[in-house]
């Protein structure tokens, strides 16, 4: 498969970081699968229990003395990856963790040190940074798979004025999923456009312990972006439980094969 962009979204503990880092390290053996794999941690996104080597981690945290330095640092670092890729120095995989935390960080930083004295300053700043990040995190340019995360947001129904009947604060009518990646401002409706795949994760209980379920096809409650939905026929699964990134790619690779060939072969185990 050519390098592609994957967005994984869900609440905390749904398994986003586990799947993202499984592209870098085997979580059962701690074997390093991607020596040049990179886990970019934004703000408070981190998990030392996943045993990813420090050499494969890049962190961006707020310095209260220079609040905007962490934001500009993210952009400069990503630009550096772009320059390196142009010279043939390509990462094995990039795991950007994650968009919602960056969104929160932008607001936090702007509150500490506003850039302009008007009410729209934060939103212009937010749009500028988010646009830059989504444009630079291009798998075709960087030459590797890019995995990103976001937390889960819920459809806003708004508040209706009893006197006028007017509803304010609601999501527009084209938002027809109850759950989707959690963002603010312009990016709230645009994040999935910058990914080839967008999958929803949730944690479920079972008699054998917690299951981290990744939904692969749309069912109405949660937003899914699946570019091969027109080829998604049995025995392809509607979801994967406690899967690794490699297992996800196997299913997607199988979905990309001609339908007649798939029926003969079945899904790879």
Language-model features, listed with the residues they occupy:
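Structured loop/turn residues at beta-strand edges in well-structured enzyme cores
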Residues: 89, 142, 193
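Generic domain-boundary/flexible-linker signal
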Residues: 48-50, 105, 157-158, 209
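P-loop NTPase motor core
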Residues: 93-189
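Residues immediately flanking
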Residues: 42, 98, 203
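Phosphate-binding/switch region of NTP-binding enzymes
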Residues: 9-13, 146-235
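Conserved P-loop
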Residues: 1-93, 101
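C-terminal regions of RecA-like/P-loop NTPase motor modules
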Residues: 1-4, 207-269
């Amino acid at each position: 498969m050519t390098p592609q962009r994957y967005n994984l979204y869900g609440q905390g503990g749904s398994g986003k970081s586990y799947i993202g880092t499984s592209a870098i390290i085997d979580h059962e053996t701690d074997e390093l699968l991607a020596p040049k794999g990179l886990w970019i941690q934004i703000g408070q996104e981190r998990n030392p229990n996943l045993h990813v080597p420090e050499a494969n981690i890049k962190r961006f945290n707020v310095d209260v003395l220079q609040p905007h330095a962490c934001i500009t640092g993210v952009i400069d670092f990503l630009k550096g990856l772009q320059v390196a890729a142009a010279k043939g120095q390509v990462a094995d995989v990039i795991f950007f963790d994650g968009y919602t935390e960056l969104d929160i960080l932008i607001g936090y930083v702007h509150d500490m040190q506003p850039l302009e004295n008007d009410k729209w300053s934060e939103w212009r700043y937010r749009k500028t940074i988010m646009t830059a990040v989504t444009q630079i995190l291009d798998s075709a340019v960087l030459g590797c798979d890019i995995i990103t995360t976001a937390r889960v947001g819920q459809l806003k129904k708004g508040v209706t004025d009893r006197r006028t009947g007017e509803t304010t604060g609601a999501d527009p009518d084209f938002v027809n999923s109850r759950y989707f990646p959690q963002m603010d401002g312009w990016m709230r409706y645009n994040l999935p456009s910058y990914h080839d795949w967008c999958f929803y994760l949730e944690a479920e209980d079972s008699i054998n312990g917690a299951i981290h379920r990744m939904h692969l096809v749309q069912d109405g409650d949660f937003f899914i972006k699946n570019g091969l939905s027109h080829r998604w026929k049995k025995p392809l699964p509607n979801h994967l439980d406690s899967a690794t990134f490699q297992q996800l790619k196997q299913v997607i690779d199988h979905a990309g094969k001609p339908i007649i060939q798939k029926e003969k072969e079945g899904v790879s185990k």
